[in-house]
Design a protein with these regions (language model features):
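NAD-dependent ADP-ribosyltransferases
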Residues: 1-206
Length: 206
């Protein structure tokens, strides 16, 4: 398994390299935009006072990064070839087909949970074996979209942007159009603590 961060830091010669994996950028379209508090919170994750109105300046840019998670990616190409495999990694000399996706995901999730160590996590100061045993694994899988990772706001497009932001998993499944040739299907393995919060992992591969 890779991680969002390992793909972002990969060899630029590999097709899977993507410096902006899991990133979201929101910017205004050269003019100030007035946003209600609820929409502001949906777009940025920042709490606003109930009933507040916020003016987003003409030069506003908000960048956010999805927590680092384990991922497994493959091509949906119905006629896979070695050439497709080598675009991902030049060292690949073979490829295989996944014939039962549900079984593949279930077994991979089982193996991942069995291999987790305290050292796999970013914030290890508060991590204990008891804490480790209380983690749950959420698996989200679907095809990647290729409509980019930037929302450009004007007064007319605010609601459209809010609707897009309500899908918290949109960003780890969003890619730039340049990657569309791969027809990527992605499996995201999200670890959550006892409070349901996503726990970021280190970029190391599994």
């Amino acid at each position: 398994l890779g991680t969002l961060q390992s793909y972002a830091d990969d060899d630029p010669n590999f097709f899977r390299f993507d410096q902006r994996e899991g990133a979201l950028k929101i910017s205004t379209n050269g003019q100030a935009v007035h946003i209600d508090g609820q929409s502001f919170q949906a777009l940025t994750g920042c709490v606003a006072l109930n009933g507040a109105r916020i003016e987003a300046g003409a030069g506003l840019t908000v960048k956010s990064q999805f927590p680092n998670c384990y991922i497994f990616c493959f091509s949906q190409d119905v006629f896979p070839t070695l050439n497709v495999a080598r675009k991902i990694d030049a060292a690949y000399d073979d490829w295989y087909s996944i014939t039962d996706l549900r079984k593949f995901i279930a077994r991979t999730a089982e193996l991942l949970l069995g291999q987790l160590k305290v050292s796999d996590f970013e914030n290890t100061d508060d991590v204990s074996l008891d804490w480790l045993g209380g983690l749950t694994l959420q698996v989200v899988h679907r095809p990647c979209s290729y409509d980019g990772r930037e929302l450009v706001l004007d007064q007319e497009s605010i609601q459209q942007a809010v609707n897009a932001s309500e899908d918290m998993f949109r960003w780890p499944f969003s890619k730039e159009l340049a990657h569309s040739e791969f027809q990527e299907y992605r499996i995201l393995f999200v670890l959550r603590d006892a409070q349901g919060q996503i726990v970021p992992v280190k970029k190391n591969l599994k």
